[in-house]
Curated annotation (Swiss-Prot):
Catalyses which reaction(s): acetate + ATP + CoA = acetyl-CoA + AMP + diphosphate
Binding positions (ATP): G397, E398, P399, D421, T422, F423, W424, Q425, T426, D512, R528, R539
Organism: Ralstonia nicotianae (strain ATCC BAA-1114 / GMI1000)
Biological process (GO), any one: acetyl-CoA biosynthetic process from acetate
Positions that bind CoA: R197, G198, G199, K200, T317, S536
Function: Catalyzes the conversion of acetate into acetyl-CoA (AcCoA), an essential intermediate at the junction of anabolic and catabolic pathways. AcsA undergoes a two-step reaction. In the first half reaction, AcsA combines acetate with ATP to form acetyl-adenylate (AcAMP) intermediate. In the second half reaction, it can then transfer the acetyl group from AcAMP to the sulfhydryl group of CoA, forming the product AcCoA.
N6-acetyllysine: residues bearing it: K625
UniProt record similarity statement: Belongs to the ATP-dependent AMP-binding enzyme family.
Posttranslational mods: Acetylated. Deacetylation by the SIR2-homolog deacetylase activates the enzyme.
Protein's name in the database: Acetyl-coenzyme A synthetase
Gene name, Swiss-Prot/TrEMBL: acsA
Length: 660
């Protein structure tokens, strides 16, 4: 995997605005370097200081890092704390009790607000209700819920009593839900009658019932149902209870259960290359520390900020930057039930205007789809909305193409808002490589520099460091507090997946190709290692070819995959969404030729796609991620055998198959 060629040349640089630097939590590159130097000089002391300063401990820790069972590292192991206490009591005690914790906007546009005092009372009532059902410390609880205040309450209540939650995204099928229920050994499932998305109801309770009827789910004793819409649902006497009834009559206070710092706060499933999902296990102490620190560092959180992360609580972004980080930091945050295109593609901009959002954090794929919508319909263009409240933008989930970055910076940020392009993963717990908005000069398409304490490097397939300018494998050389602890029930898979022997067994394998700039030291993510293309012996990252395509004024979105080719070994296949209607026939052939030539000029002839297909959209999960595995199957002409239960737009698959 060494020797990936970096073909994307980006020379635009944006310095942090002086007014932003003046008030930043980390102001200027000298402040960043000072923190990095502290971590280099005394790694354990650096993390110990931060953990003592930022977390509330029931029992202070005496040991910082234990590496004796590497790669099964532990942090602050003899300390005890509670995540819910750090998110709720902290705010009751420091003057935030009557501050709005969550502004919830439902799919239909209705709004509810809840203060920290009210949220604390709700969490306590529900936690007491869970205890009354016999749910205890160490039990696993599956949460299969819509985006809602109740979803956050369920997660916080589990943390409060020491139960380990496993949130399953509301778009997953009954089979996918059942696999997770069985693998984690859940004793309870918390769900809703329905969830609303884009004006449509999805029957969560019916899906949960189907999952629980499958073999292996017998350990589930309780199903708790949040009545979101009031729709009639099947009811199993003795097993099923309404959420409000579980809370009814319970006290507004609930003593927290202190847990060890290494106690599993949650298990979150992520896709595995072999098909079986991986249960990523996260700790309480180290994870919560990083969730809080990155809120303060990357998002430069201020006391009066309104923060909005558009992710779902079913994904890690919704755990760290909705359920835990903002609450631990005492933020006011927006939680949104719906989708960015309902009732129209101006929904995000309308909500920023309505709630006076200061920090907006979303996915590049959402940005690209909204660029297309704005080009097609002036009424949904962001220029029609007052976005002056924004002071910081962020992106998450995949690399952002430079041209999408520029549109975001200009049209949403008004040219004044720094953009934090954050690289991280389910397994890392929080941001790993990201600009600090008051310190780092920004380069479109680059996630810039590792955060203080994160020892990122680029190596070859034997684990040897590569020189700057040469693409290779992204790794992390030292353990960090928020890292994955194991794969639930499968420690050997954990070791092989993340600390492979061929890299020496002690380097964390991120699974992404990356290159570090010779001049700045900035990291650019080139795509997943398994997305690297090898065309006539030239190794190229898909992200760079996609960026070249999206830089064309006709193109809204593009995804690039490889397929076998007798002549070149691998051929580049591009799936393209234009800013206008999908072309056909001679017109499609002409635009494809023009785009090939465009890529040839932007990168070089070697990067020209052999096959370009046009679609109305790309296959995406409900969280907005492009499902590249499906595109690889289409490019190869194979039948699609992968799980498509999270696919937002199944009809697009047939369209792309036929678009030859």
């Amino acid at each position: 995997m060494a020797g990936i060629e970096s073909v994307l040349q980006e020379t635009r640089v944006f310095e942090p605005p002086a007014s932003f630097v003046k008030q930043a939590n980390i102001a200027g590159m000298d402040a960043y370097r000072t923190l990095c130097a502290e971590a280099e000089r005394d790694y354990e002391g650096f993390w110990a200081r931060l953990a003592h300063e930022h977390l509330l401990w029931h029992k202070p820790f005496s040991k910082v890092l234990d590496e004796s069972r590497a790669p099964f590292y532990t942090w602050f192991e003899d300390g005890e704390l509670n995540a819910s206490y750090n998110c709720l009591e902290r705010n009751l005690e420091n003057g935030n009790a009557d501050k709005v914790a969550v502004i919830f906007e439902a799919d239909d546009g209705s709004v509810a607000r809840i203060t920290y005092r009210e949220l604390h009372a709700r969490v306590c009532r529900f936690a007491n209700g869970l205890k009354a059902l016999g749910i205890r410390k160490g039990d696993r609880v599956v949460i299969y819920m819509p985006m809602s205040i109740e979803g956050v309450v369920a997660m916080q209540a589990c943390a409060r009593i020491g139960a380990t939650h496993s949130v399953v995204f509301g778009g997953f099928s009954a089979k996918s839900l059942q696999e997770r229920i069985v693998d984690v050994g859940a004793v309870a499932v918390i769900t809703a009658d329905e969830q609303m998305r884009g004006g449509k109801a999805l029957p969560l309770k019916a899906i949960a019932d189907e999952a629980l009827a499958m073999e292996g789910s017998e350990a589930v004793r309780h199903v708790i149902v949040y009545r979101r819409t009031g729709a009639g649902v099947n009811w199993v006497e003795g097993r099923d209870r309404a959420m409000d009834e579980v809370e009814a009559g319970q006290p507004d206070t609930c003593e927290v259960t202190p847990v060890g710092a290494e106690h599993p706060l949650f298990i979150l499933y992520t896709s595995g290359s072999t098909g079986k999902p991986k249960g990523v296990q996260h700790s309480t102490g180290g994870y919560l520390l990083w969730a809080l620190l990155t809120m303060q560092w990357t998002f430069d959180l201020k006391p009066d900020d309104v923060f909005w992360c558009t992710a779902d609580i079913g994904w890690v972004t919704g755990h760290t930057y909705i359920a835990y980080g903002p609450l631990a930091a005492g933020a006011t945050q927006v939680v949104f039930e719906g989708v960015p295109t309902y009732p129209n593609a101006g929904r995000f901009w309308d909500m920023i205007q309505k709630h006076r959002v200061n920090t907006f954090y979303t996915a590049p794929t959402a940005i690209r789809s909204l660029i297309k919508a704005a080009e097609a319909d002036e009424t949904s263009h962001p220029k029609r909305y007052d976005l002056s409240s924004l002071r910081l933008l962020g992106t998450v989930g995949e690399p952002i193409n430079p041209e999408a970055w520029m549109w975001y910076h200009t049209n949403i940020g008004g040219g004044r808002c720094p953009i934090v392009d954050t690289f991280w993963q389910t397994e890392t717990g929080g941001h790993m490589i990201s600009p600090l908005p008051g310190a780092t000069p920004l380069v479109p398409g680059s996630c810039t520099l590792p955060l203080p304490g994160i020892m990122a490097a680029i190596v070859d397939e034997t684990g040897q460091d590569l020189p700057d300018g040469q693409g290779g494998i992204l790794v992390v050389k030292r353990p960090w507090p928020a890292m994955i602890r194991t794969i639930w029930g499968d420690p050997e898979r954990f070791r092989k997946s993340y600390f492979p022997a061929e890299l020496g067994g002690k380097l964390y394998l991120a699974g992404d190709g990356s290159v570090r700039d010779k001049e700045t030291g900035y990291f650019t993510i080139m795509g997943r290692i398994d997305d690297v293309l090898n065309v006539s012996g030239h190794r190229m990252g898909t992200m760079e070819i996609e960026s070249a395509l999206v830089a064309n004024p006709l193109v809204a979105e593009a995804a690039v995959v490889g397929r076998p080719d007798d002549m070149t070994g691998e051929a580049i296949c591009a799936f393209v969404v234009l800013k206008r209607t999908r072309p056909n026939g001679d017109e499609a052939r002409q635009i494809a030729t023009d785009l090939r030539n465009w890529v040839g000029k932007e990168i070089g002839p070697i990067a020209k796609p052999k096959d370009i297909r046009f679609g109305d959209n790309l296959p995406k999960t409900r969280s907005g991620k492009i499902m590249r595995r499906l595109l690889r199957s289409i490019a190869k002409g194979e039948d699609i055998t992968q799980d498509t239960s999270t696919l937002e737009n199944p009809a697009i698959l047939e369209q792309l198959k036929e678009a030859r």
